[in-house]
Amino acid sequence: MKVLTFYLAVFGIMLAVGSASAGARTIEMLNKDDAGNKMVYSEELTRVEVGETITWVPTSKGHNVEWIAGPDGAELPKKSKNGKEVSMTFEVPGIYYYWCTPHKGMGMIGLVVVGDDVSNKGAIAKAKALGKSKKKLKALLGEL
């Protein structure tokens, strides 16, 4: 009986830990990815559900996250400090557009799609984009 209780307790702990981390996502800010692309986020197009949290983790000191546009009613946080981890919980469905301030012209941008709502796709397409970010933004929006 004690062995059964022990295994049930271990299973319960594993289930609780798995559930607690199920809504947490991590995106790395990279100087170079495994494919050789420079100045990129580990995920450039990320899909999450309402209430999920994403944490951006810098792999060097020169990266950050600056929010450029999002859906109506969404409160966009201030840009993060270079080299600092930042998290955001997404409460409003739609498309969110962000970039790395120092490397935006090199195409270091990303999109987060919350839920299945892409109704603000046109507004995101009209948002500011510089250098290589213009082509990448168009390509990412084309995937939606």
Predicted regions span which residues?
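Extracytoplasmic copper-binding redox domains, predominantly the cupredoxin/blue-copper superfamily
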Residues: 20-144
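Bacterial N-terminal signal peptides
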Residues: 7-16
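Positively charged n-region of N-terminal signal peptides that target proteins for export
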Residues: 1-6
